[in-house]
Amino acid sequence: NSPDEVLSWLEQVDPTRIVLALDVRLDVAGVPMLTTHGWQQTSGVVLWAAVERFLRSGLTHVLCTDVARDGALTGPNCELYAEAVRRFPELQWQASGGVATARDLVALRDCGVAAVISGKALLENKISSQELRPFLPNASSLASM
């Protein structure tokens, strides 16, 4: 809710070590708008404009949550993330919201997302450790799961 403050942080530290987390809700035209106040309010700021502003400071990582899908296990908004990667290929995008199956992980990887946040699907064992192995660089550590 304080972009100038975040920009000052990016100036004070190595911006490649910060992940900018942005929550969005699609408006009626399908435009991703930033949400605030625990997702209760839409800020009136378009995701793409916000990212552009922070990009100039050396930002390299963005976590984007589609709040309409978060915790719903309805599948991720691959169109949103593919558009994000298309618009800003220099960024490492992290997708959050809606992941329900290993197929969702494949779909997000295929659209260019660098990382995925999955909570409910893992907590409810919708994705097995065996299904996760291809996505983890240290998969041998899963042997104890």
What are the roles of these predicted feature ranges?
Residues 43-48, 74-82, 133:
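Charged helix-capping and loop-helix junction motifs
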Residues 65, 70-73, 94-98, 120-121:
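Glycine- and other small-residue-rich loops at beta-strand/loop junctions that grip anionic moieties
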Residues 1-2, 72-76, 124:
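Secondary-structure boundary/capping motif
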Residues 1-70:
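Conserved anion-binding
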